[in-house]
Amino acid sequence: MSRKISLMADQRGAVALEVPAVWLFLMLLVILPLADIAIVGFRYISAYQALRTFGQSILYSPPPDVTNASTWSATVTAKADSRYPIPSVKLVCGESNAVCDSTNSAATQPKYYVYTTTITVTPLVLRSVLCTSSNSNPCSFTLTYSERFQ
């Protein structure tokens, strides 16, 4: 049997034609969507950890006046991670999520710091699935975090 007939009989060359199709299938339908999900997940986890770290930093240096956050919030927001800026800090007293003032800041009421940051994701493949935010940019998500301090 000749060499050409031998190769055609066991079809060893067929894999050379199948590999590009399999590679394209794996890249477009499996790996790129998984990469999109992983990138969004890492960005979310990083932002949430930045919020937790910020909460710990202000937990160990409490505000001098819980009824007036405007006097100290500018200095503490400067301590936040620059990749995840925190626009404002709100002090909430009690379980009703009301902003602290002289009427609801009794020592028996629990007090919380509440603050937010925004992340923007740029998925390559799964834009219609991952970009579902109600913000003006559907790929931008606002994360809220609260830390009890009293």
Each language-model region and where it sits:
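Low-complexity, S/T/G/P-rich flexible repeat/linker segments used as non-globular hinges
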Residues: T118-Q150
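Alpha-helical assembly-interface signal, strongest on the long, hydrophobic N-terminal helix that forms
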Residues: S2-T77
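A short linear-motif detector with a strong N-terminal bias
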Residues: E18-P20, I37-A38, A69, C93-E95, ...
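Short amphipathic secondary-structure patches
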Residues: Q49, T53-T120, S146-R148
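Residues embedded in well-ordered secondary-structure elements
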Residues: D36, N104-A106, S134-S136
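Short, solvent-exposed coil/turn segments
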Residues: D10, T108-P110, P138-T142
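A generic structural micro-environment signature
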Residues: W23, P64, N97, R127-T132
